[in-house]
Every structure is written in structure tokens, then in C-alpha cells.
């Protein structure tokens, strides 16, 4: 953020130069730095109607889940969301959402919501003060417990949360609801973690453990259902579909995916949850509906386990004189055919034309793990010179952490960048997608050419999509181009996203399934005796290995690590689950057993699943939890 080049709202972030080689750069950043980066992002960078506080809050919560220090999250969260007691930032979120959705609250409802915001911040401030007074008493006798204040605050949350679920405005108010839910769940977690110090009885503690589980379930399901109802109604071009999804992920699902992890402490979350970006402009693709999304989603995610190194393609420039001998001409610059390249010599199928020789290669130049892509320019447009001459342009350009740029054309238009996110994959679509592709999602690591129907005017073109996520603790690439996950140097726990596998057998019956409350997507097994292998660089620490799974029917899980086999039989989550319905998956977190991540060694972890009932199985998260910090419920 030290230098800003104003060219189509382009920002070059030199701050990344400092942290490009640090696989735990996010964990090492201060909250103040994170706040400044999101403020700068909003000031100079992005066209999305997103208030910067939403990025700060998600980063703050992730850091607290990964820390042992934050026992009073609510107090700090109040200072971020309501600085100096002001509700302005929450009102900013509402105004931005109104602009994005082109919908407004009526006058009475707006007044009601603003009153609830004022009341909520005052209630939390008063509770925080009561806790401070209890911990630092200035009068006698000193109360033995703060249970009364805790129970009063709990009831106030229950009274105020429904005011952000008003009929007819559920989607518009969803970002505010998510923030209110953040505060309520943080409050409950604080009560559990501070029970001894606050004089909370064992019975009350059990009640609040149940609250954490139950309200995580209720709030997650509400957010997922509200989003999915809106998404199912979409019928729009790709840019608008992806922008809607990205907006809701930044404002809502970044939080939903953290809530189910609130039961853990000192757990560094290696997120596989993605933000997607595509270009805007007149030269864009067909319209899509929610029925097309399973294919599009599979196309964007299919090679997520590989280390991205760049793209290659065919760029063409063609000039035609105006018809009828009129003066002037039309020049078109376009990307015709594209292929995504990864470490280990792996490449995707072709996008667009399949019969053209590629004439450019765009790569990170330096090793992709040291200097990954962080920014994309994907717009297209038309420049006019007078009334007779025009130029149609298409960018498809990328920038690394060291500000090195490459692509089909020079960077221009709006750029796509999110603080602490890296471009971990690139995908794309042709002008029109064949129906036989739209109805057939790609299986895991499938290489398939995606082209327009024969004879489609402009069908050779490729329009790229950049895939952004926070995944950064990557040690190296395996020989096959997949990622080796790096365990933290200290005794902090960590996670591995199941879609980031080293290899999977039965690939034609294995798919990536979209999830919203899980810090990334699941690996869906549709054939029995499927094994997913993961590689991690160990740190010598001992962990309890938890697997988050969904098995609607009986399954058997066998985990092999360091030559030892762990077996869990009769896994059926139809009723034995945490209550969240995450896009059809119902999950608990299963304790597989105690394992050791051997020090300074590449450790393989094999997860084999037998489908005893023949029903699909979702592997949703892999969690290495410190042995001395069991889950809160």
C-alpha cells in the first residue's frame, strides 16, 4: 500500500513484498495493519459495495480462533464494530448492501433497525463494563459471580437478533444479522472460556455450551437458507453471478464458516473458501442460472489442489475496415484459447478454441509459492476515436506479490484484489458453453476442454476467472504439482481443506461440493473404497485428529498416518450431527485419535472411506487439534 498507481483504480500493494515468503503472514499481522489494509482497499481499489469493517472482523475472528489469548472476544469486537460507541460502521454496512442490491428499507423499518443498533451497542458496552467492575472491584462486598449479568445479556441478544430478520428484508439485512450473530456467539464463547474467573456454576456452564452449539446451528442455517433462496432466483451473466456470491461471502459466509470452529482454541484455520472474480464489459458471456452453477463451480474448483504457476493462450488482434468504403475501422484484441498451468507440468483443459497455437505464456516468473498472483484484471470494453474508429479490448492480466504483471494484454479497467487473499487458481469460460458440458460437472482433477458450440460467432474466445483464497501455509509442491501443507512451528493446531489432496483414487466418482459453513468445500466420495492422500510437513507435535464428515448412511473411515491405522465404523450422520444443513451435508466432528506430525518430515495422511450403505460421503474438514484443548462442545 505504499504506492498507488491510478490507472483504472489499480493499486499496487508493496506491503506484500515484505510477507511474500512468509507462509504464516496472516497470523503474524497486527489487527491495526489488517484494519489499515482493508481501509486502503476500500479507498482505492474495488467496485464492490463492501464496507471495510467486514474484512477486518473476519480477520479478527480467524486470528482469535487461532489464539489462546482472546478470552474476551466480545469486548474487542465491540471496539471494532462500534468504535467509541458509534453505530456508523454498521450503518455503512446497511447502506452498502442497499446500493449493491438496489433495495432500501422503508422509513419506519430503517428507524427500527437504527434503534436496535443503538440498543445493541449500549447493551454490550454495559455488559463489558459490568465484567470489568467484577474483575476489578472498587466496593465491598465483592460479588461471587457475574451470572446475573451474563443471563441478562443473553436475553438481550435473543430479543434483538430477530430485528435483523424482518420479513421482506431478509437478504438486505443479512450482513447486519451476521454481525449481530458474530457478537452473540462471541459472547457465549467468552462465557464458556471465562467460567471459572467469572464464577459461573457448572450447571450454567453446561447451559452455555448447549447455547454455543444450538445458536451456531440456528444462525448458520438461517444465513445459508436466505442466501440459497436468493441465489436460486438468479438468471444473469457470469460477472454478476460471481459478484453476488463474492459479496455475500465477504459479508456473511466468512463468518458463518468460522462459527462452527468457535468450539476450538488455538486452531490456525487454513481456509479453502474462495472468492471469484470475472470481467465486466460488453464482450461478455451468456447468461447463467443457478441450475448451471454446479458445472461452473466444478470448473473453477477442479484443480484447486495444485500449485498455480500461470496461464498460456492465443491473443489475436484483427482490424476490419468499415463496410461500404466508409472511413475508419474496428480493431478487436481478444484472448482466443487459454490453458491454466500448474507446478509439476500439470495443465488444465483448453478454454475457448482448441485448434490454435498459443503465442503467449504468463507465469509468476519466480517460484509461485514465493511470489503468487494476488491481483487480476479481467475487464473488456471499447475505445472510440471519433465516430468512425473503435477498438475492442480484453485484458486478462495478472500481478504477483512482487508487482510483476503478465497476461493476454496490458492491465486496465477494474482490478480484483482482496487483502490477505492469494489467487490460488485461474479458470474461465468460452462465450457460450455447450449444453452437454453445462449438465455434466467436472470430477476431481478432470481435464476437459470447454468450448463453444461449433459455428458460434466469437466462440473461440476465452474469458478468465480468478479464484482467491487465504490458503498460504504451503511448504512446497509435490512431484505431481500438488501442495504440501505446512504445520505451524509452535503447538498451534491447524486445518487442511479436504479438496487440497495429494492424490485421490476413484477420481471419476469424486467431486468437490460447495459448502458455506465450513471454511472451504468438501470432497464428495460417490464410490466405496475411495482414498484421499494428503501430505504435510510436520513439526514434531502431537495432536488429536478430528474429521468433519457427512455420511447419510453407514460408512467406515480408516485413517493411516506414520504406519498406524485408525478405524471408525458405523459412521452415520443422518441424526448424529451438529444440526447445520450445509448444502445437503449434515456433519459432526469425529475424533479419530492422537497422532504425531513427525518433525521436519513430509508426513502422508491417507483417509479411506467405505460406503456400507452406498450413499455419498462428504469429507468436509481435517483438523489437527492441540491435545490439551478439547472442543468446547
From Swiss-Prot:
Question: What are the entry keywords?
Answer: Sporulation, Toxin, Virulence
Q: Does the keyword Kinase apply?
A: no
Task: State if Nucleotide-binding is listed as a keyword.
Answer: no
Example GO molecular function term?
A: signaling receptor binding
Extract the InterPro entries matched here.
Galactose-bd-like_sf, Pest_crys, Pest_crys_dom-III, Pest_crys_dom_I, Pest_crys_N_sf, Pest_cryst_cen_dom_Cry2A/18, Pest_cryst_cen_dom_sf
GO BP: sporulation resulting in formation of a cellular spore; symbiont-mediated killing of host cell
Q: Could you share any additional remarks the record makes about this protein?
A: Toxic segment of the protein is located in the N-terminus.
Q: What's the family?
A: Belongs to the delta endotoxin family.
Known function: Promotes colloidosmotic lysis by binding to the midgut epithelial cells of both dipteran (Aedes aegypti) and lepidopteran (Manduca sexta) larvae.
Instruction: Please identify the protein, giving its name as recorded.
Output: Pesticidal crystal protein Cry2Aa
From which source organism is this entry? Answer: Bacillus thuringiensis subsp. kenyae
- Gene designation: cry2Aa
Amino acid at each position: 500500500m505504499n504506492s498507488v498507481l491510478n490507472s483504472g483504480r489499480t493499486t499496487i500493494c508493496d506491503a506484500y513484498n515484505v510477507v511474500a515468503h512468509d507462509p504464516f503472514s496472516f497470523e503474524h499481522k497486527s489487527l491495526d495493519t489488517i484494519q489499515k489494509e482493508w481501509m486502503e482497499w476500500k479507498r482505492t481499489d474495488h467496485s464492490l459495495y463492501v464496507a471495510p469493517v467486514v474484512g477486518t472482523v473476519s480477520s479478527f475472528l480467524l486470528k482469535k480462533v487461532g489464539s489462546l489469548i482472546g478470552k474476551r472476544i466480545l469486548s474487542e469486537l465491540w471496539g471494532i464494530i462500534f468504535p467509541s460507541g458509534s453505530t456508523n460502521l454498521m450503518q455503512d454496512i446497511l447502506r452498502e448492501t442497499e446500493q449493491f442490491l438496489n433495495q432500501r428499507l422503508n422509513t419506519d423499518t430503517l428507524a427500527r433497525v437504527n434503534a436496535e443498533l443503538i440498543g445493541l451497542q449500549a447493551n454490550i458496552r454495559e455488559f463489558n463494563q459490568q465484567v470489568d467492575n467484577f474483575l476489578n472491584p472498587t466496593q465491598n462486598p465483592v460479588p461471587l459471580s457475574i451470572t446475573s449479568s451474563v443471563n441478562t445479556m443473553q436475553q438481550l441478544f435473543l430479543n434483538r437478533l430477530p430485528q435483523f430478520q424482518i420479513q421482506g428484508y431478509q437478504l438486505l439485512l443479512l450482513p447486519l444479522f451476521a454481525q449481530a450473530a458474530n457478537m452473540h456467539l462471541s459472547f457465549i464463547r467468552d462465557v464458556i472460556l471465562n467460567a471459572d474467573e467469572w464464577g459461573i456454576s457448572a450447571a450454567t456452564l453446561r447451559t452455555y455450551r448447549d447455547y454455543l452449539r444450538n445458536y451456531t446451528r440456528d444462525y448458520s442455517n438461517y444465513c445459508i437458507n436466505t442466501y440459497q433462496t436468493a441465489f436460486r432466483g438468479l438468471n444473469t451473466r457470469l460477472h454478476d453471478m460471481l459478484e453476488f456470491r463474492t459479496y455475500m461471502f465477504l459479508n456473511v459466509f466468512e463468518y458463518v464458516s468460522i462459527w462452527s470452529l468457535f468450539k476450538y482454541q488455538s486452531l490456525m484455520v487454513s481456509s479453502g473458501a474462495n472468492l471469484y472474480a470475472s470481467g465486466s464489459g460488453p464482450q461478455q458471456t451468456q447468461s447463467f442460472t443457478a441450475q448451471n452453477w454446479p458445472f461452473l463451480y466444478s470448473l473453477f474448483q477442479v484443480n484447486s489442489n495444485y500449485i498455480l504457476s500461470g496461464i498460456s493462450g492465443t491473443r489475436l488482434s484483427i482490424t476490419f475496415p468499415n463496410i461500404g468504403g466508409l472511413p475508419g475501422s474496428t480493431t478487436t484484441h481478444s484472448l482466443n484459447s487459454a490453458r491454466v498451468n500448474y507446478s509439476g507440468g500439470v495443465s488444465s483443459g483448453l478454454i475457448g478454441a482448441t485448434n490454435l497455437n498459443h503465442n503467449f505464456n504468463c507465469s509468476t516468473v519466480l517460484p509461485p509459492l514465493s511470489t503468487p498472483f494476488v491481483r487480476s484484471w479481467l475487464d473488456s470494453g471499447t475505445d472510440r476515436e471519433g465516430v468512425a474508429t473503435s477498438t475492442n479490448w480484453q485484458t486478462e492480466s495478472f500481478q504477483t506479490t512482487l508487482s510483476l504483471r503478465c497476461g493476454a494484454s496490458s492491465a486496465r479497467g477494474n482490478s480484483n484484489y482482496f487483502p490477505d487473499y492469494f489467487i490460488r487458481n485461474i479458470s474461465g469460460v468460452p462465450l457460450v458453453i455447450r449444453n452437454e458440458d453445462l449438465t455434466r460437472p467436472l470430477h476431481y482433477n478432470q481435464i476437459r476442454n470447454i468450448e463453444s458450440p461449433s459455428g458460434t460467432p466469437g466462440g473461440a474466445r476465452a474469458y478468465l476467472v480468478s479464484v482467491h483464497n487465504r490458503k498460504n501455509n504451503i511448504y512446497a509442491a509435490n512431484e505431481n504439482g500438488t501442495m504440501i501443507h505446512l504445520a505451524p512451528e509452535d503447538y498451534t493446531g491447524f486445518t487442511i481443506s479436504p479438496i487440497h489432496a495429494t492424490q485421490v483414487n476413484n477420481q471419476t466418482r469424486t467431486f468437490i461440493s460447495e459448502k458455506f459453513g465450513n471454511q472451504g468445500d468438501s470432497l464428495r466420495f460417490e464410490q466405496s473404497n475411495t482414498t484421499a492422500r494428503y501430505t504435510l510437513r510436520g513439526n514434531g507435535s502431537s495432536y488429536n485428529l478430528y474429521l468433519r464428515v457427512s455420511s447419510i448412511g453407514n460408512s467406515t473411515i480408516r485413517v493411516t498416518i506414520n504406519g498406524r491405522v485408525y478405524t471408525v465404523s458405523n459412521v452415520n450422520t443422518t441424526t448424529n450431527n451438529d444440526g447445520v444443513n450445509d448444502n445437503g451435508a449434515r456433519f459432526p466432528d469425529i475424533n479419530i485419535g492422537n497422532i504425531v506430525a513427525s518433525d521436519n518430515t513430509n508426513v502422508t495422511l491417507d483417509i479411506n472411506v467405505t460406503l456400507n450403505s452406498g450413499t455419498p460421503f462428504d469429507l468436509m474438514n481435517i483438523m489437527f487439534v492441540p491435545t490439551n484443548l478439547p472442543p468446547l462442545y
